[in-house]
């Protein structure tokens, strides 16, 4: 779905939810690390992401969602592709992803949406992530 379109667009009788998120990487003591988040509502480990606001570009959505969920202000480094799946409400969802680098830590505050963050090695992330689609995304950007 093109940037700047409505969050969800009717395609016949199917509504596709548009979202964006980030794979945030840094150099750590054990090499390259990536940030994963725990969502208590689903009891899952994934990458930070969320639905786009109407009129919001995918890039702006990804940066906003990462900031809201993690407290990190980031720089987009490169596009990381797209994942498509059916969400918990049964709607088709398309998520555009970017590799990001943290610039500033605005402070994480655990909340109902994300209650824990972990910086983990790429190998540990592959074991911790709940969804195969996230592991496949991680493999594409190694």
Feature annotation, model-predicted:
Residues 1-23, 29:
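Acidic, metal-coordinating catalytic segment for phosphate/diphosphate chemistry
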Residues 18, 33, 94-98:
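Short beta-strand micro-motifs in enzyme catalytic cores
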Residues 21, 33, 116:
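Conserved beta-strand and immediately adjacent loop positions that scaffold enzyme active sites
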Residues 27-33, 89-91:
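Short, solvent-exposed loop/turn segments that connect beta-strands within catalytic domains
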Residues 35-38:
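Short, acidic/hydrophobic/Gly-rich beta-strand patch recurrent on exposed beta strands
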Residues 42-44:
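A short, flexible beta-alpha/helix-coil linker loop
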Residues 46-49:
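A short gly/proline-enriched turn/hairpin at secondary-structure junctions
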Residues 52-140:
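Unchanged
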């Amino acid at each position: 779905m093109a940037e700047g379109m409505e969050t969800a667009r009717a395609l016949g009788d199917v509504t596709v939810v548009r979202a964006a998120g980030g794979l945030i990487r840094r150099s750590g003591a054990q090499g390259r690390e990536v940030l994963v988040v725990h969502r208590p509502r689903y009891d899952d480990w994934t990458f930070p992401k969320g639905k786009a606001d109407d009129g919001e570009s995918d890039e702006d959505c990804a940066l906003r969602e990462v900031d809201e969920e993690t407290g990190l202000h980031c720089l987009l480094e490169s596009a990381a592709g797209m994942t498509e799946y059916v969400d918990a409400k049964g709607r088709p969802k398309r998520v555009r992803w970017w590799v990001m680098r943290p610039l500033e830590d605005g402070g994480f505050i655990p909340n109902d949406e994300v209650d824990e963050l972990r910086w983990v090695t790429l190998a540990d992330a592959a074991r911790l992530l709940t969804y195969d689609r996230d592991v496949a995304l991680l493999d594409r950007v190694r």
